[in-house]
Structures are given as structure tokens and as C-alpha cells.
Amino acid sequence: MTNLMDHTQQIVPFIRSLLMPTTGPASIPDDTLEKHTLRSETSTYNLTVGDTGSGLIVFFPGFPGSVVGAHYTLQSSGSYQFDQMLLTAQNLPVSYNYCRLVSRSLTVRSSTLPGGVYALNGTINAVTFQGSLSELTDYSYNGLMSATANINDKIGNVLVGEGVTVLSLPTSYDLSYVRLGDPIPAAGLDPKLMATCDSSDRPRVYTVTAADEYQFSSQLIPSGVKTTLFTANIDALTSLSVGGELIFSQVTIHSIEVDVTIYFIGFDGTEVTVKAVATDFGLTTGTNNLVPFNLGGPTSEITQPITSMKLEVVTYKRGGTAGDPISWTVSGTLAVTVHGGNYPGALRPVTLVAYERVAAGSVVTVAGVSNFELIPNPELAKNLVTEYGRFDPGAMNYTKLILSERDRLGIKTVWPTREYTDFREYFMEVADLNSPLKIAGAFGFKDIIRAIRKIAVPVVSTLFPPAAPLAHANREGVDYLLGDEAQAASGTARGASGKARAASGRIRQLTLAADKGYEVVANMFQVPQNPIVDGILASPGILRGAHNLDCVSKEGATLFPVVITTLEDELTPKALNSKMFAVIEGAREDLQPPSQRGSFIRTLSGHRVYGYAPDGVLPLETGRDYTVVPIDDVWDDSIMLSQDPIPPIVGNSGNLAIAYMDVFRPKVPIHVAMTGALNASEIESVSFRSTKLATAHRLGMKLAGPGDYDINTGPNWATFIKRFPHNPRGWDRLPYLNLPYLPPTAGRQFHLALAASEFKETPELEDAVRAMDAAANADPLFRSALQVFMWLEENGIVTDMANFALSDPNAHRMKNFLANAPQAGSKSQRAKYGTAGYGVEARGPTPEEAQRAKDARISKKMETMGIYFATPEWVALNGHRGPSPGQLKYWQNTREIPEPNEDYPDYVHAEKSRLASEEQILRAATSIYGAPGQAEPPQAFIDEVARVYETNHGRVPNQEQMKDLLLTAMEMKHRNPRRAPPKPKPKPNAPSQRPPGRLGRWIRTVSDEDLE
């Protein structure tokens, strides 16, 4: 198929930027003419998950400024605590004065884990609420999911690792530029003072009033006690002002003073900013005391989203003491003006992304891009080139019509990130006015987008003088579609104003209007030469870069695929592919490629069908001549003809399309390809349906034929579906499957063992088929070979197997593959096919069945560990999870079945307590007090050792405790009278006794007694 996509795209940049903000900014094609610059600003934040593992991210997808959203963490008390604001990378008010938001997308996901955590847990729930933040009252999971009934504005239970994407879609058009609250020159002021210019466009005003004759009466209020007079929910992100008056009357005590304060409160209940209305204001008895006020709050003071306000008063007696009784009555009004707060998208809608059950300390990443139209300040304008936006009402109308049907077109505000990535190709088709809408056709959106294109493009032709001839030629269609809304009294199309009324029109009746075939290409209108020939529209220039290609209207044409083969011999196909053909009424050889011209076949009624091989007579009776032409592509209402050197076709695949064309003569575009053989007025199936179905899907069409047909998806289908994400089972039934009023000779049936209806039937081929049938009946091996061939053909892998055979002439690779192929009933095959059997895909379990199986697996595992209370029913009540550590500790200590979803933190973090035995304590005391053989330790020392064991919950003493015990033992030994006596110490200076001398063996030693 000829690929002209690079030369034929007509992109609408605005809608492309809306649906895919990462492609960059684009000027809004309305009639707001201000010189501006386009800029993309990124936002990247790594948010730390709190202790509870839950939090809330509030996005303002349409806010025209640096504010993107805010992050709140859920506290254990159940309330939210403000963490930080989410802004663009650059602070826009520093360099720019005005801005308009073009598009914005943000992604929330987590891919990091804190220390000690080895699994990425947690889910994300997201909802776009068509209201303000203060109007939400329930922030739980059920509360968020019930905030809207639109299925395209909420998603739930998305894994935190996959993430969600928030897409900003406009809620209004024709919006003016918004002042950013930028600093302005302040001549003559102190340099420390800061003057800013905030937006005053489209203010949101909150007025707090009481019913008639209502007065707030304070009877004997103690002095110094705060009294709340007014409370109200408000929403503010930008500068605000508050004004009003209070009237104090019936003051019965002299020297009364009052303090009046206004508090602006954030989403988490904390005070964002406080304004003092009056301080030490004296009240006079016997009169009405008026307290007027008018205060302002700049954007810089609003550090988090404001959702409510309250007014409080404190009265006290001058010179008195706290607690003195005071009596007064007050009435009044209050008005809060949020500047720019009523700008569409500034405060509503809001998108809330809640994450839960994420590991504490994990990081949730928020990343995205915001595209703006910006008007720089005078300093930056000196070095920055600005340009006017391109006024394109056709693109604006197309964008409005697409987004007005976004629910039917599957365009959401919140997406699972993976799904949003898959839809990018579909968004590119929506943004390209010349795309054939193949992916949209697979999703079922093609008819809606085609109708929108028809109504959006003709409006443009009424805007420019060069389009006058086409406007007159197309007047019937425009008047039918738009009626009185096509032109205003001035003669200018209402679409030029860009107002919402340009998006009106009878879209659902659009398909009934006659398409004149004129196309608009880059605001250049081309009238084809001799566009109407024999009732067939032939336009030589529908697309840029395709002016030399012939195009015809699908109105009055039927389509059918033909399998084309190249043969080494008459029975062995070498290559197999398919080509789409169209049947056109009349003799139109000028539209055929040169290889087909001059070739025709006659029908039973004598008419000609050009493009067929002249082989006998076509078994049909027709009332006129027809031409069969090959085609390369199919667009909304036109088909592009092919000039490839394709030979004349043979076979009976086109007979059904010719008969359908001759009998019914359709006058509406046919958006389906036909295939089937005629046999005695009955339509029968033909072969190679897998190949033909793939050809139809490549052109974004369905294939219709006799009966339902189920496709065996093989490797070819896996590759094809990866490139073209369509449903491979798109086999439709024709509205008329039986043509009873065709003559009995209108068709014939081919009985070919090869099931190749496109092979030319010759006597030699018929003899070969008969011989093959006889051989199959006589030889079971040959019959098996025919069955293998039919299996290859039915699954569309004949060409793949032929190419594989060329690369494996000795079949070594095939033998190894078959030897190592999985066997039926093996573990891998049971895991893949279940109990359905080898080669039969088992039905996957439903979510409920999968959950029950998971509960049973967890329960069985717990039973093997001796945890018998974790039955499948208990696991289901516990959130389909096994027992937590707290539940296990509770069961081990109490032997009672823990409550599901109860964590029992006291049992998880409690200190382990075990008592040491008396023998263990005595042995330790003896070892510490002295060596074996010494005196037993006293009872006081044994008690000291026991106290150490008790302090350590049964554990042995640590080093410090051991030192203390040794010192205690030494002290006790010195003062203990029952201690063992010390060993005598030798005298260091005493002389040793002289040993007797040796006198001989026979001489006795003379003693002192002998001397006496």
C-alpha cells in the first residue's frame, strides 16, 4: 500500500496539543488577536508518603497560571494535612504579564521504595469533579467515586506503579488573557514595597446575608470570649477582597470595645490568612455602632487552596477583667470577591487523585507539562519575539465538535497511564483531518468523527471569497446541515465568531446528506476537472502530494479482496498476499493500471467486466458493464486507486461484489469488503479468509461474507495486531446473504482440494486435483500431508512456512523444534491452557473467581504454618490478605481469632517479656560474685541480679550492667563478715632457712643436744 502519510497530513495543532500536551503548545485558533509567545512549562515533584500510607493530590487542570495543584497527607486522626503547593518550574508572573492555558497533562505514579520494603504496594483512585473543592464533603474512596456519575471522569484501583494521567480538557472557549498578578513598576514608593497587578476579570463573589429582621444577639457573653458571626464555604487561589459592615446595637454597658477578625481557612482546616477588621473599636450605648470594612488579600498570601472563611468578634470592657458579662446585638452583611475566580477552569473542575496503602516513606512522583500562550512583560519583550495566533475557525469548530462528543469518542479526563499511552495513535488520527481513521474504525468511533468532519469543514468554505464557487456548489449540503445557522445577517458565517453556537448542527442527520466530494486542503480549494463522469466522482487531487493519483468516491462502489500468488509451478505457491479491489459501474479502463487495460470477460448477459482475465464467461447475468480496479487506501468517502502492475484477476472472489453491485446498486458509501462464492444463487465460503481479513483490517474496514467465521490467531496475527490494534475477529454478515432472484446459472462452485479459489481453473489443474484426491484415499501419509497444508492455509502461515523451508532445506531445525516442543498435558501446557486441553485456549477466570482462588491459596498456606483461623472466608473479610504481624501476635498471645482488618499495633510494637528462672539468676550471681569454691553470694546480690534480669525482660546483663554488678560484688565482699578468710601473704624480707650441709654417708650430724 502506498504510504503518503508524511505528505498528506493536515493536522489541527490545537486539538493535538489538547489531547497530547507533550507534543508542545499550539495557538488557540480563535479570534482573540494578541501577540504572544508559546511556552511549555514542566512540573516535577517527588512527594513523600506519610505514616498512614495515604494522601490526596488536588489538581486544578484548567487554572491559567503557575498553580498546578496541592498535596495533602492523611493523618491517623482521619483528617488531611497540607504538605505543599504544586507549581510550574518557572514562576510565570516574574517574566510575563498575561497568559492563557492551552493544554495540560500530569502523571502520578511511584517507582521507589523506602529502606526495608521490597514490594511496590498501593493503589490510586482519581476523579474529576465538575465543581469546586469546597463543595466536596466526603474524601473517602466511596465518596470520591460517587462524586460524579460520568464513567469517563473517574478510575479506581490503579496500581501505584502503573500510575494515572490527568488530562485537562477545556470547559469553555473564547477566553481572554488573564493577568498573572505580576509585579508592576511603583514609581515613588519605597523599594521594599511590592506592587502587583492581579486579574479583575470574571470575579467570583460570595455574599453572606441574613434573613430579614435577623440579628445576632449576645446576652451576657463573658469578656474576651470569641464569638463566630459568619461562616461560609468559598474557593480561592488568587487575590481576593472582602468588604461589608457590622452594626452593633443595644449596648448596655459603657466602655465596651470590640475586635473583629476574618479567618480564611484551607482545605485541611488550618488558617491560611487572617485579616483584622477592627481592633479596640469602642462601642457607645444607646446608638447603632457602625463598623465598615474593606480589605484585600494578594495572591502571594494564599499559600494553599482556601475553602472556607469565618468572621469572629471579641468584646471586652475597658479597664475590666476577663469574664465580665457583656451584652450587645449585631447585624450586618459580608461579601468576598475572588478576582479571576470565575474564570472557566480556575476553580472548577478539580481532579482529585487519592493514593492509599502505599508504604510509608515511599516517593510518589508528579510530573507533567503545561502549555501556555504568554504575553511577556516589557523587559522580556525586548528580547522575545511574539506572533499573532492563526485564526482558523474550521479548526476551532472541529475541536468544539470533537470535545462535545468526547463521551462517545472515549476521551477521558483521567486515565491509567498505560491506556493513555496506547490511545496516542488514536489521538493522532483525530487531529489529522486526512487520516483514514483506521484505529477509530476498530474502536467504533469512525462514523462519529467522519460526521463531525463533514459538518466542520464546509463551514470554512463560507468564510473566504476564493471559496465562493465551492460554497455555491455545496450550498445544498451546507443548508441542510446547518440551516439558518450557517450565515448571519451580515453574510459572515457564525463559525467565524468562534462562539459556542458554531458547534451546533444536526450531526446525527449528517450521514443522510449527499456528499459533493469537495475537499479543503490547507485553505486551498481545488475544483476537479470533469468531476462527474457517468455518475462517478473522480477527483485527481484530494490530498496534498497525491495530485497525480486518481481517486473515486466510495458511493456506488463495492470492495472485495483477492489473494495474489506467485507460482514456481502450478501447484506450489512461493509467496501469498492479498490486494483490495473495487467494482465500479461502467467501462472505466482509464482508472485501471496499464497491466489490466484491454482485458475483460463477458457475463452470461453479454456485458463486460473489465479487469478480469479473458477466461470463458463470468457465471453472472448483469444489466450493465463494470470495471474492477485495484486500490491502495480507503478514506472517509473516497478510495485511492493503485497503479501497481497487477495482472488481470481470475477466480470467483469478485463475483459476489459484482452481483451485489448489479442487484442493489448501493447509493451510500460501502464501509465493508465482501468475499464469497456464488453457487446456484447461494453464497458459499471461500478460502484464504485469514489473509483477506488482514487486508481489510489494514484499510480500517471489516470483512463480510457468508456465515460467522472464527479466526485461529497465530504468529502472523500477533505481529499484525501489534502494528494495527484492531479486533481480529471482525467477521460480519452481509445484510443480504441470499440472492434468490439471481438466475440458477449465476454461480458455480469450485471443488479444489487446495482450496485456492484464485487459481486459474484449467483442465490440467482439474486432472491434478482428481489425482491428488485418489492418492489421498489410497495413501494415509499423503492425506496427512494435505491436512497439514490445509492447517497452514487456515491459519494464514503458508508464506511463513514456505520461507522457513527455504532456510531449512534438510529440516534439521524443524526436527529439533518438534523434538523439544511442549507435550500435551505437560506442566507448561496446563499452565497455559488449563484443563481445556492442549491447543484449546481456556476461559480465563472472572475477577470473583480469581479472588476466591487467591483466598484459598492464602488459607492453605496459613494452614501449613499452623495458623488455622485464617479460613478463606476470614481472608476475604481481611481484604483478601493473610494475617498481619499484629493479628498473628494477638492470636499467639490470646489464642482468640483476630478481627479482620484490625492491625493490633500494640501487639506488634510491645516489648518481648520473658522471666528468667531462679536457677538461671543464682548461676549468674555466683559467676559474677566470685570464682568457684569461694563463698556463696549474699541474698542482696542475688536480688540485684534478679532486678537486672527483670529490667532486661529476661535477657542477660549488658556490658554496663555487668560492670555495675562487679563493683557491687566487690563492695559486698569487703563488708560481708561471712566472707572466706584471705590467704596468708608471704613476708617479702624474711630470710629463707639454710639447708643442711652434706657430711658424708657415715657421719651423723651433730645437734645441740649432743653438745650438752
Curated annotation (Swiss-Prot):
It holds the Pfam family Birna_VP3. A divalent metal cation binds at residue 30. Specific enzymatic cleavages yield mature proteins. The capsid assembly seems to be regulated by polyprotein processing. The protease VP4 cleaves itself off the polyprotein, thus releasing pre-VP2 and VP3 within the infected cell. During capsid assembly, the C-terminus of pre-VP2 is further processed by VP4, giving rise to VP2, the external capsid protein and three small peptides that all stay closely associated with the capsid. The keyword Protease applies. Changing residue 590 to P: Almost complete loss of polyprotein processing. PROSITE patterns: BIRNAVIRUS_VP4_PRO. Residues 514-755 form the Peptidase S50 domain. Residues 1003-1012 are annotated as: Interaction with VP1 protein. Its EC number is 3.4.21.-. This is Structural polyprotein. It comes from Avian infectious bursal disease virus (strain OH) (IBDV).
